[in-house]
Amino acid sequence: MKGRFNEFGGQYVPETVMNALIELEDAYNKVIDDKEFMDEYMYYLNYYTGRPSPLYYAENMTKDLGGAKIYLKREDLNHTGAHKINNALGQVLLAKRMGKKKVIAETGAGQHGVATATVAAKFGLECKIFMGEEDIKRQAMNVKKMELLGAEVVPVLNGVRTLNDAVTEAIRYWASNVEDTYYVLGTAAGPHPYPTMVRNFQRVIGDEARKQILELEGRLPDYILAPVGGGSNAIGIFYPFIHDEEVNLIGVEAAGKGIETGEHAATITKKEKGILHGMLSYVLQDNDGGVLEAYSISAGLDYPGVGPEHAYLAETNRAEYESITDEEAVRDGFMYLTRIEGIVPALESSHAVAYAKKLAQTLSSDKIIIVNISGRGDKDMDAVLAYLGEK
């Protein structure tokens, strides 16, 4: 069924948004098979973003853990410092093709906001970024960067003032400005066609990783690990391997202060179905079906839902989803990788690194793990120092 992954996905939106989604899907279906559009997209990915990103053998980490061979997919080396630009670039080119003059986006950690503002600056489009007031405090450097790029950062004061509320506000704004405005949704969630569209703009990660590991090792990996908030970097690296049953796909969610505390963002771990931002997926909710606040030290993971394709992969057991606490992410992810490889990962990516550290030690040396380093950690220095200061 269109826009569905089994029962997950769909378009649970008011009529005003429905018309915009129909227009968007129509435009997207035209460009995805349009050689000129895809060539332009690949040109900017290669020469503006700096793709392909390397698949790096983490020799020190591998030796230190004494188990599986670990490779890092270096999305942190992209222009703007994360995987987000792969999608922002594709969608802004689509907005341009549709004749839209303005783009809007939501952002949590600020990486998607920076990526959207960057590409909007490049193509001369007006840009408005919706960001929860709480995240504005946590990510001051990214806010300044967006403003420097010419974007207007709109503080969202509703709810708990984080990513969830920013998405709600962006959709609301889009519904009443649809004639000249394009909404660049930052993750593989929301109503159809966004989950499919974002995945297809992020699959370049997995397409490259597949080619690279075959060149380096002559075979596919045994495990692929990626952090999961909304889930776009993870679905991007997973998708080209979905039909390779021998490759274990593991998404790593944020366990925050511990699942038992209720202060976490482990949506799939909790496995409760609900409707959020126009999609049916797993959603953190209370006994009355109200959406709960998600929590993580990582501003990019504290989303109370997850992309519908991840819900589908979890339900069909094609992928498994684990969770890592703030403490593990900081010490066994962020600090560990920085010290041992000289690579500072984003706090989001640090969750996957920390799980890789656990997993690698249980495997033999003939096994191969690829970890998606979805972004770099410069933006997280303040959060990590504050966390360590509190300890």
UniProtKB/Swiss-Prot annotation:
GO cellular component: cytoplasm
A GO molecular-function descriptor: tryptophan synthase activity
Keywords: Amino-acid biosynthesis, Aromatic amino acid biosynthesis, Lyase, Pyridoxal phosphate, Tryptophan biosynthesis
Protein EC: 4.2.1.20
InterPro entries: Trp_synth_b_CS, Trp_synth_beta, Trp_synth_beta/beta-like, TrpB-like_PALP, TrpB-like_PALP_sf
CDD domains assigned: Trp-synth_B
Entry-linked Gene3D superfamilies: 3.40.50.1100
Lipid metabolism recorded as keyword: no
Keyword Amino-acid biosynthesis: yes
Pathway(s) this gene product operates in, as recorded in its UniProt entry: Amino-acid biosynthesis; L-tryptophan biosynthesis; L-tryptophan from chorismate: step 5/5
Catalytic activity: (1S,2R)-1-C-(indol-3-yl)glycerol 3-phosphate + L-serine = D-glyceraldehyde 3-phosphate + L-tryptophan + H2O
Listed cofactors: pyridoxal 5'-phosphate
Modification type N6-(pyridoxal phosphate)lysine: residues: K84
HAMAP family: Trp_synth_beta
Functional summary from the UniProt entry: The beta subunit is responsible for the synthesis of L-tryptophan from indole and L-serine.
Annotated family: Belongs to the TrpB family.
Subunit architecture: Tetramer of two alpha and two beta chains.
Protein name: Tryptophan synthase beta chain
Organism annotation: Clostridium beijerinckii (strain ATCC 51743 / NCIMB 8052)
